[in-house]
């Protein structure tokens, strides 16, 4: 239970007596900022009172008097402002008792929820192309969400919906044939370069375009030679991508790959089903679904093509089969898509068709967690000087290279092995955390000097904050694993730190509600700052009172464990030295 949920439960209990029924969201309970004296504030009473034609102050006073009547031990003081805000001060004794429980818990007192089957569709790069910087956000936002959901106890099905089918394979096969490149030579080729050359031919040569389309149809009809080439290209790409996932500390593996080709055998049935249900209509030889909720430029219902005149299927057909499979076979309770905001309208159309066809039941939650772009200093999509997408492996290597220089400057006594280890943990952590710390919905500017700094809300700062706490125990020669006891709060800063530590579960749930890992990043940064103030003002080394020292060590231990767990569930590694 979180403090917010307990307050909500108590207020709802009071209001239910006078037949007022509200939701947790209606109460609008907020945490204090560092400058405020209260710990929590209930803001929703004003709106509630206005809706009921009651005086907000009078209603707030009624709630407070009845909360006191129930004598809940967690409250030190509850007050009402003249406007109707309820200010809550948490009881120190209650906080001490609850934090002591957290220290004794491997999960920091956070209980697992009733599990749901949740599919997360993320990363999903195209085969025969190198992963570029544009894949970074989907990959690490999706992975962080998967980790958080698993930590809370949900059954998470990661799906890497790779683009292993479609026109680009027809282009590549046509190019290989045109240039007499044999099957055995494919492994020696740069697939990215091969794709780019094939794309130029496709755009400029109508005859080549025709051959491409013929090979696409051959692939769909399972032509043996085309399938053999296709498998070779897919395998080579997956091997390269898996190296990137491993370096990024991303939990996607080969077993999570369910590419577009997986649905091939289902596509004819999808077309037939939509025809039978009179959802798809034939138009000039193609099959189209017209959607009244979506309008084209002329104001007429938008048409979504699901099968072309030549019999070829489209991405729309694949995505419909994919949705049907996930809902009916995998029996998902929720499906979360981490795909580009530019796909928003298209995904809405696919969902609308799937609902019309009855593939999605009303109790399934489907959410498009769109995200903004990574931009360069000129606020345009982050790319090379020539305008090409930056290759993700190059970006990772550059981060490690820069981190290596920083680690070397900080500690010239590091061995080569230590230097390699640190540069990878710091560099990878830095680019991931910089992305995760930004609001998912906004674009952000990629700046190396901000990514790898030890000041502010960055991975290096967080990693250093963790090391700093470890050094306290090392200096005092005390084992963090063996330290135990009851927390006693004697100073105001200890109390502030304790409240912040207790909010960890609250933060995780809020982050998940909005699919917003930046909420966790912000919390961890604020926790580190409060601990820094606590460390400066509440002496650990100089304290002559052994009980006070032990208590402060317990708070330090809980802070370290919270930082480590918080970073872990968003995919950032901690380090023990620097």
From Swiss-Prot:
Catalytic activities: tRNA(Arg) + L-arginine + ATP = L-arginyl-tRNA(Arg) + AMP + diphosphate
Compartment list: Cytoplasm
EC class: ligase
Major localization listed first in the record, in broad terms: cytoplasm
Gene3D superfamilies to which the protein is assigned, alphabetical: Arginyl tRNA synthetase N-terminal domain (3.30.1360.70), HUPs (3.40.50.620), Isoleucyl-tRNA Synthetase, Domain 1 (1.10.730.10)
Motif 'HIGH' region, residue numbers: 125-135
One Gene Ontology molecular-function label: arginine-tRNA ligase activity
Residues forming coiled coils: none
Keywords: Aminoacyl-tRNA synthetase, ATP-binding, Cytoplasm, Ligase, Nucleotide-binding, Protein biosynthesis
GO biological process assignments: arginyl-tRNA aminoacylation
EC number(s) per entry: 6.1.1.19
Quaternary context: Monomer.
UniProt similarity note: Belongs to the class-I aminoacyl-tRNA synthetase family.
Protein name, UniProt field: Arginine--tRNA ligase
Organism: Buchnera aphidicola subsp. Baizongia pistaciae (strain Bp)
Lineage: Bacteria, Pseudomonadati, Pseudomonadota, Gammaproteobacteria, Enterobacterales
